[in-house]
From Swiss-Prot:
Keywords: Aminoacyl-tRNA synthetase, ATP-binding, Cytoplasm, Ligase, Metal-binding, Nucleotide-binding, Protein biosynthesis, RNA-binding, tRNA-binding, Zinc. Its main location: cytoplasm. Catalyzes the attachment of alanine to tRNA(Ala) in a two-step reaction: alanine is first activated by ATP to form Ala-AMP and then transferred to the acceptor end of tRNA(Ala). Also edits incorrectly charged Ser-tRNA(Ala) and Gly-tRNA(Ala) via its editing domain. The keyword NAD does not apply. Belongs to the class-II aminoacyl-tRNA synthetase family. The lineage of its organism: Bacteria, Pseudomonadati, Pseudomonadota, Alphaproteobacteria, Rhodobacterales. Binds 1 zinc ion per subunit. This is Alanine--tRNA ligase. NCBIfam families: alaS.
Length: 883
């Protein structure tokens, strides 16, 4: 029986023999395509090949493509674990032709592989064709499929299109008949939704182009795109009707049972199925640098992870277990996908951190859910507000709540959940732009409706004239504002940049006839630029013409910091890996801040390398170019884009730096990003770049803060001044500071050792307080001693020394150093069966104002507050020994 790995290899090797290039799977995170959450089919990486935009060295290709369907319209998450064939992660086997062969070759290729290499009985196979595709019908007859097993389908199931317009064409599908013991009918029949006839391969014939009016013409370049689910064909070839009964899933399910100490099959099997599936999707996503968060791809990952973790808890797991399953996955899939082994440490660490975090709130969240649903019956609906509270307070994604209620037959009011989510986002949006409550935003919508949006002129100029179209004060429109008043000024056009994309808003001056205002900040909302202003003289009024001038020095500083973040982003990816993605930024006048996906602190060595690389490209002084193009053209150049950003028909692309192994049309551009901010004209205008440090921003996100230009130079001067002061204090040249410092540290360590030795000698010879000499009490040797100038950390060594000296006995030491009181008790090994050091300690510490303490029968330590009670403490220990 072939394994899943064998089947993958057989498929790829077969098409390699037919002249196909074996192409590696593209990443799950589509390169330069923020419109697509995850790669969900084999053709995604070849999209531009089919349209002719991308020309490759081959015209035939075959792949085993990693796919995830757990977000957007392709969302199988709710069904995963409960059905035989739903997965969040799956592999799509495919063969492709870009204007080379067509139906006459594609259909025989498929038939030969299935009936020859895979040895599937021909009488178990059915095929479908689009109802007008006579050519495909005849080819199927020619390869030997009886007419009664070739079914014409008139629905969209057998016609594929990339979008409302563009390449499209008919499909042909191959089905396997599992037998009449399973309910269901052939494709096109009333019972087609049953499980008897299962689609195993889909062949798409891209032969047409559809236009907006619905008309179609034949394409000059006709292509082939096919897809076969590896898990489905593996189930068939391994003699099962359920993907989760194939060799890979059996292995993962049994591993899940082992780490959760539960049974792999029976009533608990569904939990293991969920865990096995989600382990795959989460591990592959983390290996590509996707980390759990509350937005975008990171939130989808978090949803999948937490669903798996809940099912682990249903199996009785009270501690993190998902990370323990990663080695099992790597052992099964690591050979085909080396990125799993390379990222194993990151995957395990991310699982453990996320599960530890989630387990802290899981029980409380489930209690709230139980309380809220306790009176609900099958068919009832949980209020959306409750589901949102679970999400907002306890980190329960909506589908986790739905999954938890599935067994009770209770639905969730998803519209109510969406409404609560929307209300929170509006509140956050209003607060985020400094405009108060969400209700205040309505005034800006009204202005847009009446006056239109603001035209931004600031890319080309810092000075401009415009007309005041509205004034807003305290959330309401006003006609005018006088000296001393604060007001938001809205004009038809402006050179002032409105805060967005991490770049702060501009400041400057605005003058009108008879008045002036200082612009302290500029915000942007719904296409309006809000000039936050203080009227400094006279009066300004709606309808007035205005002259505007941006603060040039401040704008220049902001530009330098923004351009530096682009260079920093690229340098981070080069140093740490392609998983690095921007998660946030601040480009202010005095500093820059850049948040990025990375799961651990950046080493000093890497920080130095990153800083050097950025400064290299600053000194290169290359031109910074900006171009307007379509999003597709920008992605084709390799432009970095932020997932979740909505792009219009045109985008602004900022490029800088020359690198021999770069990107872009010439392959020599260092950094290319979609960006609406303002930038320097030459990289040299940044001046210099200094990293202040790296810190944690949130789970899986690091933050680098840095300076540029004059601020960076001033920082370096301050650091040089401090170094000169240190050198002077050490009586050394700056270049010799480290050597001198090391010598001082060595000298300090030697003195500390000498002091410790002297303290021990003094203590062993006697000290201040009673009981310095050993005495016989209750038939045991006892030594009680009060010591001044001895720290608590020295007591353990003194106890051991006294044990060696007296041979057999009980020791109590009370020490005071710098106002801190420490107590230690020791019992030699031969007496621990009769008396414990812990009991001696507990008897003594109350006299010095201490409580408790703890340790082992032979050694115990505690603390106190009042050294004057040392004699009483020793007497208390003696009393214990006397019995």
């Amino acid at each position: 029986m072939p394994s899943l790995n064998d089947i993958r290899s057989t498929f790829l090797n077969y098409f390699a023999k037919q002249g196909h290039e074996v192409v590696d799977s593209s990443p799950l995170v589509p390169r330069n395509d923020p419109t697509l959450m995850f790669t969900n089919s084999g053709m995604v990486q070849f999209k531009n090949c089919f349209t002719g935009v991308d020309r490759r060295d081959y015209v035939r290709a075959t792949t085993a493509q990693k796919c995830v369907r757990a977000g957007g319209k392709h969302n199988d998450l709710d069904n995963v674990g409960y059905t035989a064939r739903h997965h969040t992660f799956f592999e799509m086997l495919g063969n492709f032709s870009f204007g080379d062969y067509f139906k006459n070759e594609a259909i025989p290729f498929a038939w030969e592989l299935i009936t020859g290499e895979f040895d599937i009985p021909k009488d178990k196979l059915y095929t479908t064709v689009y109802h007008t595709d006579d050519e495909a019908f005849e080819i199927w007859k020619k390869v030997g499929v009886p007419e009664e097993r070739i079914i014409r389908i008139a629905t969209s199931d057998n016609f594929w299109q990339m979008g409302d317009t563009g390449p499209c064409g008919p499909c042909t599908e191959i089905f396997y008949d599992h037998g009449d013991h399973i309910w269901g009918g052939p494709p096109g029949s009333p019972e087609e939704d049953g499980d008897r006839f299962i689609e195993i391969w889909n062949l798409v014939f891209m032969q047409n182009e559809r236009f907006a009016d619905g008309s179609m013409v034949d394409l000059d370049m006709q292509s082939i795109d096919t897809g076969m689910g590896l898990e489905r064909i593996a189930a068939l070839l391994q003699g099962t009707h359920d993907n989760y009964e194939t060799d890979l899933f059996k292995y993962l399910i049994e591993a899940s049972a082992t780490v959760t100490k539960s049974e792999p099959y029976g009533d608990q099997n569904v939990h293991h199925r969920v865990i096995a599936d989600h382990l795959r999707s989460c591990s592959f996503l983390i290996a590509e640098g996707v980390l759990p968060s509350n937005e975008g791809r990171g939130y989808v990952l978090r949803r999948i992870m937490r669903r798996a973790m809940r099912h682990a808890s249903l199996l009785g797991a009270t501690d993190p277990v998902m990370h323990k399953l990663v080695p099992a996955l790597v052992s099964q899939m690591g050979a085909a996908y080396p990125e799993l082994g390379q990222g194993q440490a990151l995957i395990e660490e991310t699982f453990e951190q996320e599960e530890t975090r989630f387990l802290k709130t899981l029980d409380r969240g489930l209690k709230l859910l139980d309380d809220a649903s306790g009176d609900l019956e099958k068919g009832d609906v949980l209020p959306g507000e409750t589901a949102f509270k679970l999400y907002d307070t306890f980190g329960f994604p909506l589908d986790l709540t739905q999954d938890a209620l599935r067994a009770k037959g209770i639905e969730v009011d998803t519209d109510g959940f969406d409404a609560a989510m929307k209300a929170q986002k509006e509140q956050s949006r209003a607060g985020g732009i400094g405009l108060g409550d969400a209700t205040d935003v309505k005034v800006y919508f009204d202005i847009v409706d009446a006056e239109g949006t603001t035209e931004f002129l600031g890319y080309e100029t810092e000075k401009a004239e415009g007309q005041i179209v509205a004034l807003v004060k305290d959330g309401a429109r006003v006609d005018s504002a006088k000296a001393g008043e604060s007001v938001q000024i809205i004009l038809n056009q402006t050179p002032f940049y409105g805060e967005s994309g991490g770049q702060v808003g501009d400041s400057g001056m605005l003058t009108v006839e008879g008045g002036a205002a200082r612009i302290t900040d500029t915000k942007k909302v719904e296409g309006l630029f809000l000039h936050i202003a203080e009227v400094t003289e006279g009066e300004i009024a709606v309808g007035s013409g205005a002259a505007m001038e941006v603060d040039h020095v401040r704008r220049s500083q902001i530009r330098a910091n923004h351009s530096a973040t682009h260079l920093l982003h690229e340098a981070l990816r080069n140093a740490l890996g392609d998983h690095v993605a921007q998660k946030g930024s601040l480009n202010a006048a005095d500093r820059l801040r850049f948040d990025f996906s990375h799961n651990k602190a950046v080493s000093a060595e890497d920080l130095s390398k990153i800083s050097a690389e950025v400064n290299d490209f600053i000194r290169q002084n290359s031109a910074v170019s900006t171009r307007i193009m379509t999003p597709d053209d920008a992605r084709a150049l390799g432009a970095q884009a932020l997932f979740g950003e909505k792009y219009g028909e045109e985008v602004r692309v900022v490029s800088m730096g020359r690198a021999p192994t770069g990107k872009g049309a010439d392959g020599e551009t260092y950094s290319i990003e979609l960006c609406g901010g303002t930038h320097v004209k030459q990289t040299g205008d940044i001046g210099t770049f200094v990293i202040l440090g790296d810190s944690a921003s949130s789970a899986g996100v690091r933050r680098i803060e840095a300076l540029t230009g004059a601020a960076a130079f001033a920082h370096l001067e301050r650091e040089a001044g401090r170094m000169a002061e240190v050198a002077a204090s050490l009586k050394a040249q700056p270049a010799d500071v480290m050597e001198r410092l090391k010598a001082l540290m060595d000298e300090r360590k030697a003195l500390q050792n000498e002091i410790a030795t002297l303290k021990q000698q003094i203590a062993m010879g006697g000290g201040a307080g009673g009981g310095a000499e050993a005495k016989e009490i209750g038939g045991k040797t006892f030594l009680g001693q009060a010591l001044q100038g001895v720290s608590g950390k020295d007591l353990r060594g003194l106890i051991d020394a006294h044990k060696q000296k007296i041979g057999s006995g009980v020791i109590l030491l009370i020490a005071e150093d710098d106002g801190k009181v420490a107590v230690a008790a020791g019992v030699t090994d031969d007496l621990t069966g009769e008396i414990s050091a812990v009991d001696v300690l507990k008897a003594a510490v109350p006299a010095v104002g201490g409580k408790g303490g703890g340790g082992r029968p032979d050694m115990a330590q505690g603390g106190g507050k009042d050294f004057s009670g040392a004699d009483e403490a020793i007497k208390a220990a003696e009393a214990l020994l006397k019995g």
